Amino acid sequence: MKKVLFVASESVPFIKTGGLADVVGSLPKYFDKNKYDVRVMLPKYMCMKDEWKDKLSYRLHFYMDLNWRQQYVGILELQHEGITFYFIDNEYYFNGPKPYGDIAYDIEKFAFFSKAALSALPLLDFRPDIIHCHDWQTGLVPIYLDNFRYNNEFFRGIKTVITIHNLKFQGIWDKKTVMDITGLPAYYFSPDKLEAYDNANYLKGGIVYADRVTTVSSSYAEEIKTPFYGEKLEGLMQARANCLSGIVNGIDYDDFNPATDTNIARTYSVENFRKEKVKNKMALQEELGLERDPHRMMIGIVSRLTDQKGFDLIDCVMDELCQDAVQIVVLGTGDERYENMFRHFAWKYPDKVSAQIYYSEPMSHKIYASCDAFLMPSLFEPCGLSQLMSLRYGTVPIVRETGGLKDTVEAYNEYEKTGTGFSFTNYNAHEMLATVRYAEQIYYDKKRDWNKIVERGMEKDFSWKNSAKLYEELYENM
């Protein structure tokens, strides 16, 4: 039986800030239990909900050197849905109100976490065959592992995988400070290892030292080899091309199931969505104070409100879009500029725009279930989960062809009667508007074709089962 340890900075249901948590919390459940023993290592944040903290059981503790500092490391454990979760406890590092804070503090916090995760393994009597790291927060794990191998036989032969969920975030800080924090030999701080442009770069170090590198979609794996998407690491990604692969994320089909979802007004399935889905729309219109009209096309947006997500395009054409027979429902938080932008349009067009500037999991389910279309005009999108959720709920995605959006949404072809959504290529506001209006035309004038698009989307399988099989193949070939 192969032993695999996931090391990550967040995981559902314990702590979540983005899609990384969904991957780490969901994927381990879908591996073949007869062939894989998959466990997960996380920080024990003080901001975790008490309902989870109260369930943790103490395993052990020890003290660890972090260069000249000596730090307490506590290990707690929880069995959840058949998976063993280990939590690394240290109140000095993990006592903040949020999992992440200022990068100056996070740099030391995740150096501690990476070293502690490895140092705990001999004491836990768990020797993984593969350690699967996620994003820059665990980028030092392959480097510490390389360093530990020289003096400790326990760590020899352990392989590593690092998954890049978003190359934009790399964990970059002053090289001398990182040398002092980590206690790693100067040997590791050269341009072919941890150093990048005179700074230390955690993610770069992880990519250099990991045995395999994955991203969260095939298209994104190709895109990050180019200067536009490569975030100054395109040369490294080209050099590691033979070890680089893209595996699309999935979603938990038990959590996201319109036939059993308790968050929505009316459950439905691919067999009866034509009659039942519209009842969710009318309930949401009433809840949000929009004009009640079962025939009005409703477009949803559930997102972090940041530049990456293409909201500057929406800003350019929102006035034009609001002249059409549509309603737009927005849920999310982020940059103040975009929060205020959507508040402004909700004030200007109260019957057509609803801006919910917060995040709520039940409200997100209501939007997926109620809307007719879902808009994602991202500048770049490593994978994206929202379009998978919208397909699951029969809400037709309108996306820009980039990264995971390109891989998971097949553009509608009215002549061949194929496709699960609508897409545009260039990062251009009026190209996006033309695509939205094309979707409106099909919705209003060719309702039978629209329902077939919905049907094809609902019949697609983007569950974790498919992703887990591809990760199993990756592990077997290491």
What are these regions (language model features)?
Residues 1-478:
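Catalytic cores of nucleotide-sugar-dependent glycosyltransferases that transfer UDP/GDP/TDP-activated
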